[in-house]
Amino acid sequence: MGLYQVISDLMSVEISKAYEPTKVEEKWFSKWISAKAFHADPSSEKQDYGIVIPPPNVTGVLTLGHVLNNSIQDILARRARSKGKEVLWLPGTDHAGIATQSKVERHLRETEGKGRRDLGREAFLERAWEWKEKHGGIIIKQLQKLGCSCDWDRERFTMDEEYSTEVQKCFVHFFNSGKIYRGKRMVNWCPSSLTALSDEEVIMKPQKSKLFYMRYEIVGREGEYLEIATTRPETLMGDSAVAVNPKDERYADLIGQKAFRPFPKAEIPIIADEHIDPEFGTGVLKVTPAHDKADFEIGLNNDLEIIDVLNPDGTLNELAGEEFSGMDRFEARDHVAAKLDDMGLLVRVEDYENNVGFSERADVPIEPRISMQWFLKYPKIEESIASVSDQDIHFRPERWAKTYSHWMQNIQDWCISRQLWWGHRIPVWYRKDRAEELQKAESLDKETAGDALHVGIDPPEDEENWIQDDDVLDTWFSSWLWPFATMDETTKNKFYPTADLVTGPDIIFFWVARMIMAGYEFTGEKPFSNVFFTSIIRDKKGRKMSKSLGNSPDPLDLIAQYGADALRFSIMRIAPSGTDVRFIENKNKDEAEVNDYPQVEEGRNFANKLWNAARFRQMQGSTDGVKELPDLEELSIYDIDILRKLDSLNEELSDSYSSYKFQEIANKLYDFFWSEFCDWYLESIKLSF
């Protein structure tokens, strides 16, 4: 019986006839926790293995993406333990500034009919912390239900007191070194969340828009017009010029002339700019410096007036004119077009497909907006580029290294301030007698502020004479410190740099690149050696799974129906490295019935097969203790054959682990155990029992 005896002898408790995954999984997870099986000991002399969890949003819930990501991390952590390493898998959650504040504000509106400004900052933050305490542990409990072998005693939160201190130290460090400054720039603005966003927080979506062709009369040439094409007629009240390409012969004689802006009626210059595309529309551009990034640059180069006609919430303000003031931007688009039509200045409207930037969190079109914000000049750019190109840090799949390199070589200063209340408040204080002057300054840094600005972890001693900056830091400004700010010095000395990072390619710029730069800046070392980018999970139609589409099942329902092991194993079997995952759901005609998930059902069947095989062995006699294999001559041909296949499997799996080919590992294990071990070996030796 050889191999089978060795495997089954590990079991001494009677195995029940029916496999009930919920009971089994809850029992063993409880035993693991009681035995501190996942505890990481920094004083251990064993070889270290460290991995930090990408912290999910504190008020989030488990998704299939979390299942995939954390199953891979669990495989890596358990594999390292099996190899005799001291393992730290560090868990935690992110405070998720915009996402959490939006949920709290929605709750306040629904339950009390109030907004955050009705409560005031201090009272609102009390409610936010109450919300976090009530809902913040849900996803941690769900990850435990999934069976994740983290060191749960080390759970961290990005707004823990100690972690917050590290974030403040980071800001002070960069301000004192001249890398943080405050400036008036055009930023991405979310009219829903009322905050600035970084470029990485904006996602481009294809939209079916309209292209409006309108006429601006040329000053001094009555009856002659310039025809202009635009997707945004609602901002024409902020036009301060009309621009053409200097090489466009159609308009060469008009450069230096003026045209009439339709309303409020005003003469605006016709200028030349080489960035104008003669092929777009009519080759004539309305220049609105306050509401377009390209126009803003044109405005700076030509000293144009900046006329902001939008309020922060996306409604039009008084500069747009009384008839449009207070009107939503999209409603105003139609009204402005109608007025142009009434004036005989609307030529035609065409269907037009273009890409529009949306706030990733609020899912609304963003607005380019000129605003005073805090910015960071990124540190350690060259070292961070070299670490990946020289493969000191390995990206898997390797193609993501090119994406990373391209972004790093074209990197822009990071807008780190957010107009929120939930988050790490910027540790900057303005002297009261100069606060208004400093906050309106076009540029502000360590050199220009002098002693009128206090930047520090603690407020100034005479705090009553100072006003703290209202803004908070971008959530990613705290999470880019995650690999080392989560560890005390003893733990860091043992487990940092970490071995692996498992994450999605969608946050390669938000998080991965920034962690690499922060690692070199604050520790002088890389934060991790390997980055494994997971696949995107899609439905059988190829659509990305999301709550809004209603095509994403609740993993907890799947766990209840099939078991956590079944779900984890099935996800790994369908998740090839470097390509998207197709997750199949078969809808039942009877809505009262539970839907069918054939891939997860295969996972459950496999777990059931393991259970029955173990039970079959237990029924044959004693399973106490692990016994050594007998001599070769005492083994049957069936034993020898299965041992040979097992040796071959071990070699193949070792190669697959080294290459992070988790789908390959799952399928090899499935094929070996189901076909070779159960269907062939067990059936062959049954007569010998």
Which ranges hold each PLM region?
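N-terminal, positively charged nucleic-acid-binding surface of large information/translation enzymes
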Residues: 2-247, 271, 288-301, 305-320, ...
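Long, charged, mostly alpha-helical binding arms that flank functional sites
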Residues: 16-17, 98, 106, 348-362, ...
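Active-site-adjacent bridging/hinge elements
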Residues: 45-53, 75, 111-115, 140-147, ...
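Short glycine/proline-rich turn/loop motifs
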Residues: 52-58, 120, 387-398, 492-498, ...
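Structured ligand/cofactor/substrate-binding pocket environments in proteins
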Residues: 65-77, 93-94, 163-166, 225-341, ...
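Gly/Pro-rich turn-and-neighbor structural signature
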Residues: 162-193, 201-203, 215-219, 407-477, ...
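Flexible, glycine/threonine-enriched loop-and-boundary segments that flank and lead into catalytic domains
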Residues: 197-225, 414, 443-473, 481, ...
